[in-house]
Amino acid sequence: MLSSLARVLQFGLLVFTSIFFLVDPLAAIPTFLVITAGADTGERRKTAKTAAFTCCVVLLGFAFAGTLIFRLFGITLVAFKIAGGVILMLIGLDMLRARRSPTKETLDETREGAEKENAGIIPLGIPMLAGPGSISTVMVLMGQSSEWWQTVCICIAVVITAVLSYWILAGADRVRRHLGDTGSRVLTRLMGLLLTAIAVQFILNGLADLGVVKSTK
């Protein structure tokens, strides 16, 4: 019983950290403040809620439609593991340098979003929160989940990440004030280090499935 609970907790923690670090709502704070400049508290909360809800729907949608997408385009899970790992590594390395990764969102997308009423959907919800890295991660995790509780863990992790993203964006002013620029950079680098390690593991798992390297599981 205890060993089973430990497995669930270990898997749940891995899934949550992978998804949360990729969604990275803390890194979205500067853009959120620019987009919502001049808005009152109610409007900011509404935008934050829209962004978080969009992120949740997109990630859950791709999580459950992943298998269908694989079949439709003839993509194997092994190929997606390796490709997803490469994307995660690029994002992680950019985070280690404490800079916004262009694989998540371009400057043009940020500028365009600032001029739109639905900025909570684009670019905040997509691609800032639900970007290529987080989408590919939930698809890979769901694709290699063989038991029902693993699927539940992934769904719960996505929902918790969306809720935390809302809280962080809704309180963007307070979060930025407490952390400061230096604190934000330090936290970003720590998250980047963990994300890079997860990316390496994704790639190793894919290579192990191909028989290129010995399994590390």
PLM region descriptions:
Residues 17-20, 29-35, 122-127, 135-144:
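Generic transmembrane alpha-helix signature in multi-pass membrane proteins
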